[in-house]
Amino acid sequence: MVQRMTFDAASYTAQLQDKVTRLRDLLAPFDAPEPQVFDSPLQNFRLRAEFRLWREGGERHYAMFSQDDKRTPILIEEFPIASLRINQLMPQLKAAWQASAALSHKLFQVEFLTTLAGDAMITLCYHRPLDEHWHTAANKLAADLNVSIIGRSKGKRDVIGRDYVVEKLDVGGRTFSYRQPEGAFTQPNGTVNQKMLNWAFEALGDRSDDLLELYCGNGNFTLPLATRVRKVLATEISKTSVNAALSNLDENAVDNVTLVRLSAEELTEALNEVRPFRRLHGIDLKSYEFGSVFVDPPRAGMDPDTCELTRRFENILYISCNPETLAANIAQLHDTHRITQCAMFDQFPWTHHMESGVLLTRR
């Protein structure tokens, strides 16, 4: 059965307060200040969406599955939490595949990626090779919808247009342009992401020393934070993200960043002079005067050695997608650093997930 997605907007404030209370309780043992709270739009905040396709009543529908029931599809006609652009594209794409066997044959998954700047890309995933009939239909679809189209089939990828979207975000009075590649991680809530960037920009402040950044991704935070310091050494392990970050640095004429493809654990070994790394050839780590470190780790948080590494710095600016691992990392650092600023970002409304940020300063 086709199901309309519903939610009670009036309950948003209560849900938001529950998250703030949870963060406050987790950080209470560390005498954290009251968190600044950055809310989200109630609808149309999510810039990307992924749907399986499900056949019912002789046609394919967008479908999702509950965490509690992976077998029973929830058929989707509209998706209010997704961006307006995604909601505009959903029926247009559905009409296109219904009218074209070349587009619909063995199509099993659709992914949308959009930006606040209005760019859009659609990825179509198939259980078959893509032939010239598909290319003809997909080229027309891309032109009709003014989007880029990615066709994926058994490890192969066909690109019509670009394999990335362009986002523009305003931070500290400047507009930064970001290339966001298909398949790479990007923050899903663009409005809240912009709030996070501005909070981090203000928390770091203007400094005359250098910044170490771990887990830099496509340069989401790197670009604005680089304007606050003398030099940045940034690390990222994903090759796709590294390439996007390099393009973004060039596009925005940010020339004081050195980017190396190392994991946080490997950089820890390099700084501790445990062993040399060929990927650091020509980079003099001793030339940096690090005063601050910025970390935005995965849900598991920082491993103990990386956490210990951050203790060396006067300031630790930490963005977290998991408040429990954030609290565990702070517990390791609490004897030398105290929380001077704290924030909660409602990146994921209508879920229990949240982003949080802290600035830790050496005692």
UniProtKB/Swiss-Prot annotation:
Domain of life: Bacteria
Binding positions for S-adenosyl-L-methionine per the UniProt entry: Q187, Y215, N220, E236, D296
Keyword annotations from UniProtKB, A to Z: Methyltransferase, S-adenosyl-L-methionine, Transferase, tRNA processing
Keyword flag Methyltransferase: yes
Catalysed conversion reaction: uridine(54) in tRNA + S-adenosyl-L-methionine = 5-methyluridine(54) in tRNA + S-adenosyl-L-homocysteine + H(+); uridine(341) in tmRNA + S-adenosyl-L-methionine = 5-methyluridine(341) in tmRNA + S-adenosyl-L-homocysteine + H(+)
Broad class of enzyme this protein falls into: transferase
GO-annotated molecular function: rRNA binding; tRNA (uracil(54)-C5)-methyltransferase activity, S-adenosyl methionine-dependent; tRNA binding
PROSITE patterns in the cross-refs: SAM_MT_RNA_M5U (PS51687), TRMA_1 (PS01230), TRMA_2 (PS01231)
GO biological process: tRNA methylation
Enzyme Commission number(s) from the entry: 2.1.1.-, 2.1.1.35
Record-level GO cellular component terms: cytosol
UniProt cross-references to InterPro entries, sorted A to Z: MeTrfase_TrmA_AS, MeTrfase_TrmA_CS, SAM-dependent_MTases_sf, TrmA_MeTrfase, U5_MeTrfase_fam
Alphabetical list of Pfam families matching this protein: tRNA_U5-meth_tr
Primary role: Dual-specificity methyltransferase that catalyzes the formation of 5-methyluridine at position 54 (m5U54) in all tRNAs, and that of position 341 (m5U341) in tmRNA (transfer-mRNA).
Homology family: Belongs to the class I-like SAM-binding methyltransferase superfamily. RNA M5U methyltransferase family. TrmA subfamily.
Protein name according to UniProt: tRNA/tmRNA (uracil-C(5))-methyltransferase
Native organism: Pseudomonas fluorescens
